[in-house]
Amino acid sequence: MLKKIIILFLGIFLLSSCTDNFRNYFQRSANNKLFDVKGAKGGKRKPVYNNKYIALAKKNIVEDNIDYDNDVDDNYDNDGPLISEKIDNVKRNREMYLNMIKSDIARQKAEFSATQSNNVMTLSKANKKVRKDDSYKEKKIEEELNQIKAMLKETKRDITKYTCPNATVNQNYVPPVTNYEHVNYPPIKNSNPYNNTSKVKQKFIREDDDDTNNACSI
């Protein structure tokens, strides 16, 4: 058992010696994660910068407000063989931010074109809108008609409550004319006096009395 522990310890030590720095091997990533498998591209990870710093750098690039470092690094000898391998950090950063600005402009153009295409009124969209408006209007008109029908039914029901139950509706009834002009006819000569005791006259009087008794009182 002790031999296995010693072999395991030596194996871990040998594997850790392959790294550049054993302490930095288990450090968190730029995204503050211990095991981060997202964002890696080509075996390299883009560092996470401060958004305010990036916005300020883009603004300086657009406004051409760049401070060039004219100081010569002491680690490089002007006459030495490594002068050609010196990296221009200002130029590299400028190119990086220019690429970021170009990508932002392309993304903004794509978003603007997408919104414009959605806002453009085509024939099909216009037809759909007209159909929707027409269907809404038809629905409102139908609701109003149903309300009017219900009101008419209720009014008719109220009217039937106040009608005489014994009264019959005569379809051929014509209301009497009351706005006629009075005409004075000449008296009829040689007319016989009315017989008040005639049976026919008494019959009509009885019928009139029956009609008045069956009439509805107001």
From Swiss-Prot:
Protein name (Swiss-Prot/TrEMBL): Uncharacterized lipoprotein RT0399
Keyword terms: Cell membrane, Coiled coil, Lipoprotein, Membrane, Palmitate, Signal
Lipid moiety-binding residues (N-palmitoyl cysteine): 18
GO CC, alphabetical: plasma membrane
Presence of the UniProt keyword Nucleotide-binding in the record: no
Membrane-related topology note: Lipid-anchor
Signal peptide: 1-17
Covalent lipid sites (S-diacylglycerol cysteine): 18
Compartmental location: Cell membrane
UniProt feature coiled coil, ranges: 136-164
